[in-house]
């Protein structure tokens, strides 16, 4: 079967790899000059199935009000003038109940755990290297309230049989030796030994090369103007004056997926702006050995070979990609507070990207009401974590195979309802 994939981020490239491995003739189209040059370029570098959780959580609405008055707040909101933003925030608010949080987190963990299994198999099969480490992740708590609040996440981890360790301040140094100097600032930590880290952009670039070796064609620097429709199906992709035709089409355009399919269906994928800095290591003993997540500032600090990546925060501001100096200041403050002297933040590169987020946190993977159109988008801050599993799942669906995990609650159909024979958004 001929399959066209729109988007060459980590999710699009993973989809291409698994589809090619299943025997399909795959073409990837992207406007950029190469793979992983937008959202996948400089993310936090974590592969964290155990920390797969929705931003829509109990207590977040009240926290959001408090964060409005804090200098280093992890969340910021600025109205972009669209009705869609207001609808999306309202639906996110509705998902902040304990019941919905539990459902959303459980299915996110399901996909993320499966994706890690797929990644491990990929690594065993191909030997792909991407500055990866398998030292686990460590969530750091600065207050007793944060530590107590982790109970709901631990319950989900237990139910999903995800290994974890609850560490006291004195035990943190066993996972991250450099934290011994700052343990007095912390009340404890939640460590997930099965999580991994690495450079997502490097991973995506090398996975694209593996996909090419399987026959995948990559068409970069190519405009993607729209979908040609005939007889209720997709008849091709309009790329300038050319129409690229296939048997099946996959939209993996991240935050841009919503507008791209708007004439066919409404999907609630909104850009969640994040930031990162990447600093050279200057003192090995003072640097992290794996990755930590600062629960207070929602910032991840990740070790690469000779670099430290610091990433996080969320701004609900539309498609604005302005680099804000105040956000860099927050990232530098966080890493220098926990790992003082480990990296030279004065020489750090500064980046921003738009994560494609759904209001319930779960990505949209699978079939759509259009028989030959598939979606693989909405992974939020967990694009790399979920990429291999999402790609394999999509390849199974397109190939007519039963996926290895439950997939019906991952598709766009959870957001759509039929009204008078037409598809309408259930969230409107």
Curated annotation (Swiss-Prot):
Binding site for FAD: 3-17
Catalyses which reaction(s): a D-alpha-amino acid + A + H2O = a 2-oxocarboxylate + AH2 + NH4(+)
EC main group: oxidoreductase
One Gene Ontology CC term in the entry: plasma membrane
E.C. code: 1.4.99.-
Superkingdom assignment: Bacteria
Entry's Gene Ontology BP terms: D-alanine catabolic process
Cleavable signal peptide: none
InterPro entries on file: DadA, FAD-dep_OxRdtase, FAD/NAD-bd_sf
Pfam families linked to this entry: DAO
Cross-referenced Gene3D superfamilies: D-Amino Acid Oxidase, subunit A, domain 2, FAD/NAD(P)-binding domain
GO molecular function, one term: D-amino-acid dehydrogenase activity
UniProt pathway annotation: Amino-acid degradation; D-alanine degradation; NH(3) and pyruvate from D-alanine: step 1/1
Entry keyword Oxidoreductase: yes
Keywords, comma-separated and alphabetical: FAD, Flavoprotein, Oxidoreductase
Names of the cofactor(s): FAD
Similarity remark: Belongs to the DadA oxidoreductase family.
Function statement: Oxidative deamination of D-amino acids.
Name of the protein: D-amino acid dehydrogenase
Chain's gene name: dadA
């Amino acid at each position: 079967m001929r399959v066209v994939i729109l988007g060459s981020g980590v999710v699009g490239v993973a989809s291409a790899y698994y589809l090619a491995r299943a025997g399909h003739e795959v073409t990837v189209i992207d406007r950029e000059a190469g793979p992983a040059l937008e959202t996948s370029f400089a993310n936090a570098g974590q592969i964290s199935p155990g920390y797969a959780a929705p931003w829509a959580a109990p207590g977040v609405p009240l926290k959001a009000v408090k964060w409005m008055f804090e200098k280093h707040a992890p969340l910021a909101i600025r109205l972009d003038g669209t009705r869609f933003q207001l609808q999306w925030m309202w639906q996110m608010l509705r998902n902040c109940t304990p019941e919905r949080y539990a459902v959303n987190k459980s299915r996110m963990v399901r996909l993320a755990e499966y994706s890690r299994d797929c990644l491990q198999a990929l690594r065993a099969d191909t030997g792909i290297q991407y500055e990866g480490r398998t030292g686990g992740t460590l969530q750091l708590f600065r207050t007793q309230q944060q530590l107590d609040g982790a109970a709901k996440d631990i319950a989900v981890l237990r139910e999903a049989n995800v290994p974890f360790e609850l560490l006291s301040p004195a035990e943190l140094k066993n996972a991250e030796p450099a934290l011994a100097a700052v343990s007095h600032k912390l009340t404890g930590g939640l460590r997930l030994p099965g999580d991994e880290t690495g450079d997502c952009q490097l991973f995506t670039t090398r996975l694209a090369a593996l996909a090419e070796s399987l026959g995948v064609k990559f068409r970069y620097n190519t405009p993607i103007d729209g979908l040609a429709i005939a007889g209720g199906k997709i008849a091709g992709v309009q790329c300038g004056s050319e129409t690229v035709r296939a048997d099946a089409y996959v939209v993996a355009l991240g935050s841009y997926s919503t507008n791209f399919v708007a004439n066919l269906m409404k999907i609630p994928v909104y850009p969640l702006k994040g930031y990162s800095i990447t600093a050279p290591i200057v003192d090995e003993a003072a640097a992290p050995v794996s990755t930590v997540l600062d629960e207070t500032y929602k910032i991840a600090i990740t070790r690469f070979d000779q670099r430290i990546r610091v990433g996080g925060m969320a701004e609900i501001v539309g498609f604005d990609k302005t680099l804000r100096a105040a956000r860099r200041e927050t990232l530098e403050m966080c890493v220098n507070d926990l790992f003082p002297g480990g990296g030279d933040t004065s020489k750090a590169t500064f980046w921003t990207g738009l994560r494609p987020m759904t209001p319930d946190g779960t990505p949209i993977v699978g079939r759509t009401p259009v028989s030959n159109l598939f979606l693989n988008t909405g992974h939020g801050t967990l694009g790399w974590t979920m990429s291999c599993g999402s790609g394999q799942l999509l390849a199974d669906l397109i190939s007519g195979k039963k996926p290895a995990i439950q997939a019906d609650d991952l598709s766009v159909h959870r957001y759509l309802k039929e009204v008078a024979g037409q598809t309408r958004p259930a969230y409107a």
